[in-house]
C-alpha cells in the first residue's frame, strides 16, 4: 500500500515534466529505390515504404500463418470463388503533411484507385509509373482480376476471371498497398505525379519526413494511426551498407536495431551484455539464377554442369559461417508442398566436365552486389568461390560487382549470365515462389531471373492456383519442382536464419520470417 501511495504522490510531478521524444534508429543495408512500392519488388524498398507508411486490405500474420483484417474489417467470398466483397474499416486517416492535407478519411474510392492504376493501361496513373508494376505483373494480377468496383462508400467488390487460391494472401503483399486517391488527384492536377514516388502519403504507422539517398530516411509517428500511435515519436533508417559499421553504430548507441548482421557479428553480439540477438528461420532461398536466354546457358546440360561443379558445403561454411542450411531446391523445407524426394545435385566436378565435353564455352559473367545482406552475407567471397568451382570444371567466368539499384534494374532487363539473388516468400504460400520466379508473365515483368518460359511449367503453376485442395496443389507443385530441378534453372544456395541485433533497451521487436518489418509497437526503454 505504501508503494501505491508513493506512486500516486509522484504522479502529478511526473506528469508536469515534458516527456522527451523517443526515437528509434534502425541501421539498414541499402537505400530504397523509391517510395511508390508498386514500382519495385526489393525487400529494402518494401521495408521503407509499404511496411512503415502504408496499409493493405489484409495482412498476413506470420505467427498464426493466416490472413488477418487490416483496412478491410471483414470480407466474404462467393460460392464460385470469383467474387470477394470487402467491408472497409471506417475512420482511417491518411497522413497529414506540409504537402498534403486530406479532407476525408479512407473510403472505397481509394481502394478502387489503388488497383485500377495497376490493372488498366488506359488509367493515367498506369502510364506515369516509370518502372511499371513488376510484382503485380509477375503475380498475373491484370489477368486475374476482372474488375474492381465500389459497392458502397466503405465496401469494395473484386471480381476474378477465375478462382485462385492465392488471391487473398496476395493482397497482403507490399504492392497491394492502398493509396489516397485524393492525394493522387492533387498531384495530377499540379502536373507532378512523380511525387507519389518521392513524397509518399499512406495510412500507416509512420509519416514520411525526408530522404537522403545512401544516408537516411526520416519518419514521424502517425498520431492518427487506426491501430494506435506508435510507441516511438520518430523512426530513422540509417542507411549503412557495411555490416561492420552497422555493428559499431549499434554498440555506440547510434542505432537501436541493426538489420542483416554478418554471422560473426551475431556471435560477437551474443557476448555483449548491452545487445540482444533476435532470430527466426527465414522463409527465403538464396540462389544463383542462370539466364536461360544467354548461350551457353540455354543448354540444360551446361546448367546441370554448373550445379554439379558447385561445392555447396564449402560455400555455406565460408559465406554463412554455419548460420544457414543447404538449399537443394527452390523452397524452404517448411513449405507445405516441399518435395523431399528430389535429390540435390552432388558436388561432382568430373561429371560436370563430362557434360561439357566438346562444348565451346564463352566466358561468363557472375553478377553480385557490393554489400552483404541476409541472403548474401559476403557477396565478394561467394562470387570468388563460385568462380573457382566453375574453373575447376572448365568454365571461365569473371565477377562483376554492381550497385544494388543498378543490379536489379539490369537483371530485370536480362543482361546477366549468373546472378546472385534471393527470394523471400511473402505469405507462406508455395505459389509465392513459383509465379514470380518461373512464370512466363514474370519474364516480361523482369522478376523471372532465370528468364525461363515453358508452357508446361506455366500450366502447372496455373493449375496449382486454381486447385481447390491443398492435396491437389501439392501434387502439381511437386511436378513443378521436379521440372525446375531437371532444367537446373537455379543454382540453389541456402536457406538462411534471419537475424537482427538490438540494444537491450529495445522492446517489442520481432524478426519476421518473410523479411517484412513492423516498428509500430517497438519501444525504446529509458
From Swiss-Prot:
Identify the InterPro entries for this entry: Peptide/Ni-bd (IPR030678), SBP_5 (IPR039424), SBP_5_dom (IPR000914)
Give UniProt keywords alphabetically.
Answer: Peptide transport, Protein transport, Signal, Transport
Superkingdom of the organism of origin: Bacteria
Pfam families for the chain: SBP_bac_5
- Signal peptide span: 1-21
Q: Name one GO biological process term.
A: dipeptide transport
Q: Which SUPFAM superfamilies match?
A: Periplasmic binding protein-like II (SSF53850)
Entry keyword annotation includes Transport: yes
A cellular component term from Gene Ontology for this protein is: ATP-binding cassette (ABC) transporter complex
Show the GO MF annotations: peptide transmembrane transporter activity
Q: Which family, according to UniProt? A: Belongs to the bacterial solute-binding protein 5 family.
Q: What else is known?
A: DppA5 was not able to complement the DppA1-A5 penta mutant during high-throughput screening.
Function statement: Part of the ABC transporter DppABCDF involved in the uptake of various di/tripeptides.
Q: How does it assemble?
A: The complex is composed of two ATP-binding proteins (DppD and DppF), two transmembrane proteins (DppB and DppC) and a solute-binding protein (DppA5). Five orthologous SBPs (DppA1-A5) are present in P.aeruginosa, which increases the substrate specificity of the DppBCDF transporter.
Protein name stated in the entry: Probable di/tripeptide-binding protein 5
Q: What is the lineage of its organism?
A: Bacteria, Pseudomonadati, Pseudomonadota, Gammaproteobacteria, Pseudomonadales
Amino acid at each position: 500500500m505504501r508503494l501505491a501511495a508513493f506512486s500516486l504522490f509522484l504522479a502529478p510531478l511526473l506528469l508536469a515534466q515534458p516527456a522527451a521524444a523517443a526515437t528509434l534508429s534502425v541501421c539498414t543495408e541499402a537505400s530504397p529505390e523509391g517510395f511508390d512500392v508498386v514500382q519495385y519488388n526489393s525487400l529494402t524498398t518494401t521495408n521503407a515504404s509499404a511496411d512503415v507508411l502504408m496499409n493493405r486490405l489484409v495482412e498476413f500474420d506470420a505467427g498464426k500463418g493466416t490472413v488477418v483484417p487490416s483496412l478491410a474489417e471483414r470480407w466474404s467470398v462467393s460460392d464460385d470463388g470469383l467474387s470477394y466483397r470487402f467491408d472497409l474499416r471506417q475512420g482511417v486517416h491518411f497522413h497529414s503533411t506540409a504537402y498534403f492535407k486530406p479532407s476525408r478519411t479512407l473510403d472505397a474510392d481509394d481502394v478502387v484507385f489503388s488497383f485500377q492504376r495497376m490493372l488498366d493501361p488506359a488509367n493515367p496513373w498506369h502510364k506515369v509509373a516509370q518502372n511499371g508494376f513488376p510484382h503485380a505483373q509477375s503475380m498475373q494480377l491484370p489477368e486475374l482480376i476482372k474488375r474492381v468496383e465500389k459497392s458502397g462508400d466503405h465496401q469494395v467488390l473484386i471480381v476474378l476471371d477465375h478462382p485462385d487460391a492465392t488471391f487473398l494472401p496476395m493482397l497482403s503483399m507490399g504492392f497491394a498497398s492502398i493509396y489516397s486517391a485524393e492525394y493522387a488527384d492533387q498531384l495530377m492536377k499540379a502536373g507532378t505525379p512523380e511525387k507519389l514516388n518521392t513524397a509518399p502519403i499512406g495510412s500507416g504507422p509512420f509519416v514520411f519526413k525526408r530522404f537522403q539517398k545512401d544516408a537516411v530516411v526520416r519518419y514521424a509517428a502517425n498520431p492518427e494511426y487506426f491501430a494506435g500511435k506508435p510507441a516511438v515519436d520518430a523512426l530513422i533508417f540509417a542507411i549503412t551498407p557495411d555490416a561492420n559499421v552497422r555493428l559499431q553504430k549499434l554498440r555506440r548507441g547510434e542505432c537501436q536495431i541493426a538489420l542483416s548482421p554478418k554471422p560473426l557479428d551475431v556471435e560477437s553480439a551474443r557476448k555483449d551484455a548491452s545487445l540482444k540477438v533476435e532470430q527466426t528461420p527465414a522463409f527465403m532461398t538464396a540462389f544463383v539464377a542462370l539466364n536461360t536466354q544467354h548461350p551457353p546457358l540455354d543448354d540444360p546440360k551446361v546448367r546441370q554442369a554448373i550445379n554439379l561443379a558447385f561445392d555447396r558445403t564449402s560455400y555455406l561454411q565460408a559465406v554463412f559461417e554455419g548460420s544457414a542450411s543447404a538449399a537443394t531446391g527452390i523452397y524452404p523445407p517448411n513449405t507445405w508442398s516441399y518435395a523431399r524426394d528430389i535429390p540435390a545435385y552432388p558436388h561432382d566436378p568430373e561429371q560436370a566436365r563430362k557434360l561439357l565435353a566438346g562444348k565451346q564455352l564463352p566466358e561468363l559473367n557472375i553478377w553480385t552486389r557490393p554489400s552483404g545482406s541476409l541472403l548474401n552475407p559476403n557477396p565478394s567471397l561467394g562470387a570468388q568461390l563460385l568462380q573457382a568451382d566453375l574453373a575447376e570444371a572448365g568454365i571461365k567466368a569473371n565477377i562483376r560487382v554492381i550497385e544494388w539499384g543498378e543490379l536489379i534494374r539490369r537483371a530485370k532487363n536480362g543482361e546477366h549470365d549468373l546472378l546472385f539473388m534471393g527470394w523471400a516468400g511473402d505469405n507462406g504460400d508455395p505459389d509465392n515462389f513459383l509465379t514470380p520466379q518461373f512464370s512466363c508473365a514474370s519474364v516480361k515483368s523482369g522478376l523471372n531471373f532465370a528468364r525461363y518460359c515453358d508452357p508446361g511449367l506455366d500450366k502447372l503453376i496455373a493449375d496449382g492456383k486454381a486447385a481447390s485442395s491443398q492435396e491437389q496443389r501439392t501434387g502439381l507443385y511437386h511436378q513443378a519442382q521436379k521440372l525446375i530441378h531437371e532444367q537446373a534453372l537455379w543454382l540453389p544456395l541456402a536457406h538462411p536464419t534471419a537475424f537482427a541485433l538490438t540494444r537491450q533497451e529495445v522492446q517489442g521487436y520481432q524478426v519476421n520470417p518473410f523479411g517484412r518489418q513492423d516498428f509500430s509497437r517497438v519501444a525504446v526503454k529509458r
